[in-house]
Amino acid sequence: GSPLGLSGTVTSGIVSALNRPVTTGSTNAESYMDAIQTDAAINPGNSGGPLVDSQGRIVGVNSAIATLGSSFSATGSIGLGFSIPFNQAQRISDELIATGKSTKPLVGISFDNTYTGVGARVAGITAGKAAERAGMSVGLIVKTIDGFKIYDLITAIVRIRSHAPGDQVTIAAELPTGGTKTFIFALDSAPALP
């Protein structure tokens, strides 16, 4: 990296968590990512660089940090860094190189952002998309996706976005009438992004 113009800089740290649902500062669903959490310093100039394991294999692409904000004395890296998992970054870069565009997975669900229970409540289903074809309906509360516990709508969005279009997902949901049901289906593709 080259933070503050200091070329050849390397930082070290440990991976604290995998599959950490984080947002990059906006409440727009596009800003949610499935991240690797690390305490390796990420500063302007070395974000976008690789996160490597002890054998030099790339495991992620450094992309964001948590900060205390300008109202606190500490700014910059505080030991909470986030990297995009390499398999996700590689899929997108391969698409961009091949087609000039990238795709993202689409399930065809909107979630209720006022729901405060554990899980993500389905507020809307897009006609003709994967969720409707699988039999999902409004009012379901998504509890797990591929075995990962869903705590809220952010966790649900991040779990879906960790996949590629066409991947098969398994969603377990609580029915409005009680009980649970499992839905297994392939994800659709959202329109390509330039």
Regions found by a protein language model. Give the residues of each.
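Active-site loop architecture of trypsin-fold serine endopeptidases
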Residues: 1-14, 19-93
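C-terminal recognition in membrane/secretory proteostasis and scaffolding
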Residues: 40, 54-58, 67-68, 81, ...
